[in-house]
A protein has these predicted regions:
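Short, low-complexity N-terminal leaders and the immediately following helix N-cap/first helix
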Residues: 1-77, 330-355
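Helix-rich terminal scaffold detector
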Residues: 1-17, 178-305, 309-315
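Flexible glycine/proline-rich
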Residues: 20, 34-39, 48, 91, ...
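Structural signal for hydrophobic packing residues in well-ordered secondary-structure cores
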Residues: 24-31, 49, 112, 155, ...
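Short, glycine/charged-enriched hinge/interface segments at domain edges or termini
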Residues: 2-14, 67-230, 235, 369, ...
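Short, hydrophobic/aliphatic alpha-helical segments
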Residues: 41-55, 93-105, 294-295, 299-301
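Generic structural signal for well-ordered, non-membrane alpha-helical segments
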Residues: 12-20, 34, 38, 60, ...
C-alpha cells in the first residue's frame, strides 16, 4: 500500500475506535426476561446458563450398521466365526447378554448389548445364515459412541448471553429441555426525515425520491430480532421532529433515525435534540458515514445516521448493531476479518478509515481474493447490493495497487 500525506485529515474527527468506546460507555443491557418454548427461541438471547440434565448419549450406542461383538473375540490374525444371537434396533435394544463366540446384529443409534464393546461394519464381515466370519485388523471400541461422550450430566452447555442458533435449538431438544429463559426483545423505534422523501405506494412529485433508508433499517433491525416501531417519514419542521422523538421515547428502548436529524445541519433540529436530551454531533474519521449523532432522548438511547443510503448502512453495521447487541444482552463477538489479495486497484487518501464495498470470491486458481464493486459513492446503494464484504482500508493507507493484501470483513460475519 502506498502511504501519502494526510491531506484528508480532520483534527476534530473521532476515530472509529474512540466513538465505539464512548458509545459502549453509555449503554446498559435492558432489564426483563421471559420463558419461551424452544420452537420460539431461535435468535433470542439466552438469559440463563443451561446445564445438561442427562448424559448424551444416555447409553453406549452403535455409530454404524453392523455387528456388536466382544473386543476379546477380535482375531489378531486369521479369521474367527461368531454366532448371531439377536438384533439390537434403534429404540428397541437387545436385552440379553452377549458372551464369547456370540454377536448381535445392530443398527446405527441402537444400544450396545450387554457385554459388547465393538462394532464391525456390515460390509466387513462374511455372513452365512446365523454365523459371521470376520478377519483381523479391527480395533477394540471402534464405531461405538460411549455414554456421556458428547455431554455429561451437569456439564455447562450454553451460557447466558448466547444468541440461540438452529444447532442450539436442536441441542436443547436433545437434552429434553422444552423451554428456556430469554432476554425480552429490545424495542427500537426508527424513522426517516426529509420533505423530499416519498413512501412506497405514493406517486413521486418533482424533486422527491423514494424512502429507501427506512426499508433498509427495517431489514437490518429485523435480522437482529428486535421489536420494531416504524414511525414512517417525519417532515422537516420543528414540531414534527419533536413530536416524533417524544413519541418514540415513550415506547422504545432505542431510537434510530436517518437524514437531517443525524447531522444537525438545521438549527431547529439541533436545538430540538439538545432540548430533549443529551446529544453529541460527531464527525467520524471514516468514509462513508462521517456524520453520526449519539446520545439520549429522555432515558432512551438515540442514534442519528447519515441520509446517504450507503453511509447509513455502514454506520449501522459499525456502530448501531454492536450497540443494540450489547443492549440486548448478547455476548460480545468480533466480526470475522481476513487478509486477502485485492485484484483491482483502489483509490484512497490517508486521513480516515474507509469501508469500500467488495466482492470476496475464489479466483481461477482457487485463491480467495477480493475486488471492488466499482464506484464507491455514498449514495450508490447498488454497490452494497452487489457486495458481499467491506474492504477496510486503515487511516494511514493511500492508494492500493493490484495484488496488495487488504483486510476484508464478510457481510455474513456481521449478521
Amino acid at each position: 500500500m502506498k502511504t501519502l500525506t494526510c491531506d484528508d485529515y480532520d483534527p476534530n474527527s473521532l476515530t472509529v475506535e474512540v466513538a465505539l468506546q464512548r458509545i459502549d460507555r453509555d449503554l446498559q443491557p435492558i432489564v426483563g426476561e421471559e420463558q419461551v418454548a424452544i420452537r420460539s427461541a431461535l435468535d433470542r438471547i439466552l438469559a440463563e446458563n443451561i446445564f445438561s440434565p442427562v448424559n448424551v448419549p444416555p447409553h453406549n450406542k452403535s455409530a454404524m450398521d453392523g455387528y456388536a461383538v466382544l473386543g476379546t473375540d477380535l482375531p489378531t490374525e486369521g479369521k474367527v466365526q461368531l454366532a448371531i444371537v439377536g438384533t439390537s434396533w434403534a429404540g428397541k435394544p437387545y436385552t440379553n447378554p452377549i458372551t464369547t463366540g456370540q454377536c448381535a446384529r445392530i443398527f446405527t443409534g441402537a444400544v450396545m448389548p450387554i457385554g459388547t464393546d465393538t462394532v464391525i461394519m456390515q460390509e466387513q464381515v462374511e455372513r452365512q445364515g446365523e454365523m459371521i466370519t470376520l478377519s483381523a485388523g479391527h480395533r477394540i471400541g471402534q464405531h461405538v459412541c460411549l455414554i456421556g461422550e458428547d455431554l455429561q450430566t451437569d456439564q455447562l452447555v450454553l451460557v447466558t448471553g448466547k444468541k440461540l442458533l438452529p444447532a442450539d435449538i436442536g441441542l436443547l431438544a436433545s437434552l429434553g429441555i422444552p423451554e428456556v429463559k430469554v432476554k425480552r426483545r429490545l424495542r427500537v423505534a426508527f424513522f426517516s426525515t426529509g420533505d423530499e422523501l416519498c413512501s412506497l405506494g405514493e406517486v413521486l412529485q418533482p424533486g422527491q425520491i423514494y424512502d429507501s433508508n427506512r426499508y433498509t433499517l427495517y431489514a437490518l433491525l429485523n435480522r437482529l430480532g428486535v421489536d420494531m416501531i416504524d414511525m414512517g417519514v417525519v417532515r422537516d419542521n420543528p414540531q414534527a421532529v419533536e413530536t416524533a422523538l417524544l413519541s418514540a421515547a415513550l415506547t422504545s428502548d432505542v431510537i434510530v433515525t436517518s437524514g437531517g436529524v443525524s447531522v444537525g445541519d438545521a438549527d431547529y433540529v439541533t436545538e430540538t435534540l439538545r432540548r430533549l436530551g443529551e446529544i453529541n454531533f460527531w464527525k467520524i474519521a471514516m468514509k462513508p458515514g462521517k456524520p453520526l449523532t449519539f446520545g439520549k432522548i429522555k432515558a432512551v438511547s438515540f442514534f442519528g445516521l447519515p441520509g446517504n443510503p450507503v453511509s447509513a448502512m455502514v454506520t449501522f453495521y459499525q456502530f448501531v448493531q454492536p450497540a443494540l447487541q450489547r443492549m440486548m444482552g448478547q455476548n460480545k463477538s468480533t466480526p470475522l476479518q481476513i487478509k486477502v489479495p485485492c485484484v483491482s486497484p483502489l483509490k484512497k487518501r490517508p486521513g480516515r478509515i474507509e469501508f469500500q464495498r467488495g466482492i470476496l470470491e475464489p479466483d481461477e486458481q482457487g485463491r480467495l481474493v477480493v475486488r471492488t464493486t466499482g464506484k464507491q459513492g455514498s449514495a450508490l446503494l447498488s454497490s452494497m447490493s452487489q457486495a458481499n464484504c467491506f474492504i477496510i482500508l486503515p487511516i494511514d493507507c493511500g492508494e492500493v495497487t493490484v495484488e496488495t493484501e487488504v483486510l476484508v470483513e464478510p457481510f455474513a460475519s456481521l449478521i
